């Protein structure tokens, strides 16, 4: 089995092949996201703790978190699921995925170093791969340089050098996202003011409508009562005329 081990602190990754079954037994029957001591891999791994982040079986099917089985299952996957990338909007597809429990049928197991041990691993912990781009979000720039809210983030943006042959060297900086400026605060105040204005207008319109509705209902009630009174008068008039006619006979 191959072990694809990464160390986020240095940005390095290393693929090692382990033929000895006894060294791998420590990972068997463990689930994804479990932290395991890597002492069994050899003397240089003493003190290291790794997290199982995934893997692929011998046919190339990936492990999926949450599928509690050793074998392969076919799941209906949609946008947002791991192990699937939709090609069309709203597309769903039934795909074969492997369970999240590690066993001997895997060809590659992905591990992430959580805790560094006593010794350095050549090509993994002794070298550092510099990041190609710096942070873009304002809060992340603050976190990187340990800045307070009063400090100006724009001065600390990591600039990317653009060196072309025969041209003047220049640098390029990303646009800072979520940067709080007076203009942003003004926009926020305007949004809140407009919202309050809309609420006030809606309340006034609702009150006006309720007033008009009450007026119309009162008019309709008066009209109905008038009609009822008219009918009663007519019926009483008919009754009195029929009585007088019968008495005359």
Swiss-Prot record:
This is Small ribosomal subunit protein eS6. Disulfide bonds: none annotated. Component of the small ribosomal subunit. Part of the small subunit (SSU) processome, composed of more than 70 proteins and the RNA chaperone small nucleolar RNA (snoRNA) U3. It comes from the Eukaryota. The modification (3R)-3-hydroxyarginine is found at residue 137. Residues 217-249 are annotated as: Disordered. It is found in: Cytoplasm; Nucleus, Nucleolus. GO terms for molecular function: structural constituent of ribosome. Residues 236-249 have a biased composition (Low complexity). There is a cross-link at residue 14 (Glycyl lysine isopeptide (Lys-Gly) (interchain with G-Cter in SUMO2)). The modification N6-acetyllysine is found at residue 211. One of its GO terms (biological process) is positive regulation of cell population proliferation. The modification ADP-ribosyl glutamic acid is found at residue 35. Residues 217-229 have a biased composition (Basic and acidic residues). Ribosomal protein S6 is the major substrate of protein kinases in eukaryote ribosomes. The phosphorylation is stimulated by growth factors, tumor promoting agents, and mitogens. It is dephosphorylated at growth arrest. Phosphorylated at Ser-235 and Ser-236 by RPS6KA1 and RPS6KA3; phosphorylation at these sites facilitates the assembly of the pre-initiation complex. Keywords: Acetylation, ADP-ribosylation, Cytoplasm, Hydroxylation, Isopeptide bond, Nucleus, Phosphoprotein, Ribonucleoprotein, Ribosomal protein, Ubl conjugation. Pfam families: Ribosomal_S6e. Belongs to the eukaryotic ribosomal protein eS6 family. The keyword Nucleotidyltransferase does not apply. Its main location: cytoplasm. One of its GO terms (cellular component) is nucleolus. The modification Phosphoserine is found at residues 148, 235-236, 240, 242, 244, 247. Component of the 40S small ribosomal subunit. Plays an important role in controlling cell growth and proliferation through the selective translation of particular classes of mRNA. Part of the small subunit (SSU) processome, first precursor of the small eukaryotic ribosomal subunit.
């Amino acid at each position: 089995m191959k072990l694809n081990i990464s160390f986020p602190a240095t940005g390095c990754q290393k693929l090692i092949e382990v033929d000895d079954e006894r060294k791998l037994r420590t990972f068997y029957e463990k689930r994804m996201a479990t932290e395991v001591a890597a002492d069994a891999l050899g003397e240089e791994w003493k003190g290291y703790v790794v997290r199982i982040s995934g893997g692929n079986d011998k046919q190339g099917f990936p492990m999926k978190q949450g599928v509690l089985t050793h074998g392969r299952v076919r799941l209906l996957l949609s946008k947002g699921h791991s192990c699937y990338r939709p090609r069309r909007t709203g597309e769903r597809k039934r795909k074969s995925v492997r369970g999240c429990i590690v066993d001997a049928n895997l060809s590659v197991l992905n591990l992430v170093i959580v805790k560094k041990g006593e010794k350095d691993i050549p090509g993994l912990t002794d070298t550092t791969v510099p990041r190609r781009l710096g942070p873009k979000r304002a809060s992340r720039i603050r976190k990187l340089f340990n800045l307070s809210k009063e400090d100006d983030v724009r001065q600390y943006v990591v600039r990317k050098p653009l060196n072309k042959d025969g041209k003047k060297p220049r640098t390029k900086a990303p646009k800072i996202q979520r940067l709080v400026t007076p203009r942003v605060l003004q926009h926020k105040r305007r949004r809140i003011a407009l919202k309050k204005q809309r609420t006030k207008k809606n309340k006034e319109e609702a009150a006006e409508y309720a007033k008009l509705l009450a007026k119309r209902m009162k008019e309709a009630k008066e009209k109905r009562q008038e009609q009822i009174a008219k009918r009663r008068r007519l019926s009483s008039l008919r009754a009195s005329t029929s009585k007088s006619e019968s008495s005359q006979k």
